[in-house]
Amino acid sequence: MTRYEIEPRNRVRQLAEKAHYDHDSVHGVLDAGLVSQVAFSQGDQPFIVPMIYGRQGQTLYLHGARKARLVRLLAANPKVCVHVTLLDGIVLARSTFSSSMNYRSVSVFGSPELVDDPAEKEAALRVISEQVMPGRWAEVRPSTDRE
């Protein structure tokens, strides 16, 4: 079983026995999610924004308009954290202290890169579209150059 390296920044400390670092578990969460939270900083100001995404192999594609301020900020930041959470259930107990949530989550650390090549852009858009709307890519007309 292939695993991601455990480092100080990704090591689960509380309830560590529930943590999984194998590719199947991590990719399973990423493949089931629809929206990610992307965290980065500009100067001394932290930001976190929701973005749709798609995974292909070891690459995460984030969707954003090239002219958007956010995309320019991400491209200028050498480090980001992409987080995805899946809520599996709410556990109701006889006390609020014993109530909880069952969830799975993944934090991915990396450096964003703009996709400039038109063919790679289309391939990335297909990956993102299939993440959010499986099978829809085959049902719609091709994108135009302007789009």
Regions found by a protein language model. Give the residues of each.
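A short mixed-secondary-structure module that forms the rim of ligand-binding clefts
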Residues: 52-90
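A generic structural micro-feature
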Residues: 45, 74, 100-104
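Charged, gly/pro-rich active-site loop segments
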Residues: 1-17, 89-147
